[in-house]
Design a protein with these regions (language model features):
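Catalytic zinc-binding patch centered on the HExxH motif and its immediate surroundings
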Residues: 79-104, 340
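Active-site-adjacent bridging/hinge elements
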Residues: 26-33, 84-86, 91-95, 128-139, ...
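Short, solvent-exposed turn/loop segments enriched in Gly/Ser/Thr/Pro and often Arg
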Residues: 70-82, 131-133, 182
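Zinc-dependent metallopeptidase catalytic helix centered on the HExxH motif
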Residues: 93-194
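Active-site-proximal alpha-helical
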Residues: 59, 152-298
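Alpha-helix capping and helix-loop boundary segments enriched in small/acidic/polar residues
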Residues: 43-47, 81-85, 104-115, 146-154, ...
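Beta/coil-rich, acidic/histidine-enriched accessory regions frequently appended to metallopeptidases
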Residues: 263-352
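Non-catalytic architectural context of zinc metalloproteases
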Residues: 1-69, 82, 99, 103
Length: 352
């Protein structure tokens, strides 16, 4: 017999039956379990557990105690051509391709495994950012109708910024691999003409009827609050670091938002995320927010990255290239598409 305190609590706990393999570990003393189901080959369970544990430890260390859960469950269903996830307060339901698990002879994480680690990182971060910190219109959720907010950039976009960043912070991927992921994100957004038609605030608000009802013209008409939201979060983080001379970061803002949630259990009203960010840091960020959220101007990526010694170049590359990190400039044949590539302006890159 299973019992919950409310209907809301019931639907926040996914259920799966079948043949399931359990892998257990602890992160900061909190029990975690990965439940694998579906069809998948043998894989390096030791490495997989160690990598997920490092990611969880790193995310837990960023936020003040207590964590929003006393135990955590990853439900991972594996098959062919699967990818996705849905967050819950103390668990997540994930779908992934069976070939994304690490093989015994894998050295540096390959593309498929990196994407899998990023999926774990993304949905785990949602325990703080969405399931705890959330828009006021989601507290509580109204399940009888759509809930509209301009703030999805702050909840999905910021989470998308941190998901890959935590792979670098936890050292499950190299700084160079992280910069390649970042270059690919920039390339995807720049190749979307919809960024010149729709603002981030509009993208967030119209998610119900545009982002989740896409057609063949969508790339020309809309921009992703996940992808562009992640780049806006990157710029915001770097601007805060530079303007405060390192006293504050986006981490500082997220930590205080979580404290606010723990103290009040109230959601964030529209536009108040930006107000609270400026209160926490003591910085005037209105010009940035106006540009990033309410205009279709391109984000100041090159200027922001230059502040931490990273140079952003746009060069002709085949579409399948997608963007990359380069320690030295490389000559490439002209192509019809622009791709983003990074090069270091010093002899090393350090991400913290």
């Amino acid at each position: 017999t299973f019992q919950t305190a409310s209907y809301a609590e019931l639907i926040d706990h996914p259920v799966e039956t079948g043949i399931i393999e359990f892998l257990d570990f602890e992160a900061q003393g909190i029990p975690h379990r990965i439940a694998l189901s579906g069809i998948y080959p043998d894989f390096d369970r030791t490495r997989f557990l160690a990598d997920i544990q490092k990611i969880c430890e790193t995310e837990l260390a960023m936020f003040p105690s207590p964590a929003p859960f006393t135990e955590y469950l990853f439900l991972l269903h594996l098959g062919d051509n699967l990818y996705g996830g849905l967050e819950h307060i103390s668990s997540t339901a994930l779908l992934a391709d069976r070939h994304s698990l690490p093989s015994y002879d894998m050295g540096e994480a390959d593309k498929a495994y990196t994407e899998l680690l990023g999926l774990f990182s993304h949905e785990y971060f949602h325990a703080w950012n969405v399931k705890s910190i959330k828009p006021a219109v989601f507290a509580p959720y109204n399940l009888d109708q759509e809930n509209y907010t301009e703030q999805l950039w702050a909840f999905e976009g910021i989470t998308s910024y941190y998901d890959d960043l935590f792979l670098a912070r936890s050292k499950t991927i190299s700084p160079e691999a992280y910069l390649t992921l970042l270059a690919q994100s920039i390339t995807r957004v720049q190749q979307t003409q919809g960024r010149l038609k729709q603002t981030l605030a509009q993208s967030s608000f119209s998610a119900w009827d545009k982002f989740y009802k896409q057609d063949e013209n969508s790339p020309n008409a809309i921009v992703s609050y996940y992808q562009k939201g992640a780049l806006a979060a990157l710029c915001l983080d770097l601007i805060i670091r530079e303007k405060s001379q390192g006293k504050y970061t986006l981490d500082s803002v997220m930590q205080q938002h979580y404290r606010d949630w723990c103290n009040t259990h109230q959601g964030i009203p529209e536009k108040h995320w930006q107000i609270r960010c400026q209160e926490i840091t003591g910085l005037d960020l209105e010009t940035f927010f106006q540009t990033a959220l309410y205009s279709t101007e391109d984000l100041p990526l090159a200027e922001c990255l230059q502040s931490v010694g990273v140079k952003l170049d746009f060069i002709p590359l085949p579409r399948q290239h997608g963007g990359a990190f380069a320690s030295e400039p490389q000559s490439v044949a002209p192509a019809n598409d622009l791709g983003a590539r990074f090069k270091q302006s010093s002899d090393h890159a350090v991400l913290t």
